[in-house]
Amino acid sequence: MSSKPDILTIDPLVPVMKERLEKSFTLHPYTSLENLKNIAPAIRGITTGGGSGVPSEIMDALPNLEVISVNGVGTDRINLDEARRRNIGVAITQNTLTDDVADMAVALMMAVMRSIVTNDAFVRAGKWPSATAPLGRSLTRKKVGIAGFGHIGQAIAKRVSAFGMEVAYFNSHARPESTCHFEPDLKALATWCDVLILAVSGGPRSANMIDRDTLDALGKDGFLVNIARGTVVDEAALLSALQEKRIAGAGLDVFQNEPNINPAFLSLPNTVLQAHQASATVETRTTMANLVVDNLIAYFTDKTLLTPVI
């Protein structure tokens, strides 16, 4: 019988993570609740992604679960109250993906405002010799509203300021260390800005916070960028606003029903779409994978976590 702790792996493992985990743990890929019954008492740890989390039925099925190591920074799909009640440690890959996610927010903003994807398609379709390429919008002197002003939101502010853009932010509380204007009313922020960038945490508190009223406040010349969670946006309201051109466009990295997104998005020329790729660089994903493993090793060595939430 192996002396290695048994770990349930909910998401597929990248090679560097799998190789390192196999040296210290016995791995059990999750397939179904039915199959989990056979190994449930042995499972002491879980690896998962921020998008997958740990469904309650899985947590409930594991009587000896001690630790969850998340490959990401989102915990909205983990019942943290239940984890606290059961004294289950939870760790995330804190401070590993801030720069790449902020870069993606700026890339989406530029792509949709400057019509980069539309112009790429225009050239590839051979239209350049006989037609006029569509115009984009300037970034300089535009106003950017950032909803959510944690590490990622502040990194976005630093980047867009370099373009000569004015920044204000909405957050649960003011950040006195920032020189940007704090706007406690989200609709007022949407009314003020030309670009609204979403960097809030997921979960019930932020669910559908971007609704029809907020989008109408953003207006026909406004752009929406979402690198937060798909649940933050009322997608029916967003699709309606895009189809009716009540907002100018949207750059979206996240959706409500990933990866099976609403097909209505696919035919909209005023959108730029990504497959939840904001942190998807070789460098960052390698750093994240190593931290997931390091947290598990630290826990099973001396019951500590390097980047704990709980």
From Swiss-Prot:
Class of this enzyme: oxidoreductase
Binding, NADP(+): 151-152, 227-229
Keyword NADP found: yes
GO molecular function, one term: glyoxylate reductase (NADPH) activity
Assigned EC number: 1.1.1.215
Pfam short name (any one): 2-Hacid_dh
UniProt catalytic activity: D-gluconate + NADP(+) = 2-dehydro-D-gluconate + NADPH + H(+)
Subunit structure and binding partners: Homohexamer.
Family: Belongs to the D-isomer specific 2-hydroxyacid dehydrogenase family.
PANTHER family attached to this UniProt entry: 2-HYDROXYACID DEHYDROGENASE YGL185C-RELATED, 2-HYDROXYACID DEHYDROGENASE-RELATED
Reported function: Catalyzes the reduction of 2-keto-D-gluconate to gluconate. Can also catalyze the reduction of 2-keto-L-gulonate. Can use both NADH and NADPH efficiently, with a slight preference for NADPH.
Name of this protein: 2-ketogluconate reductase
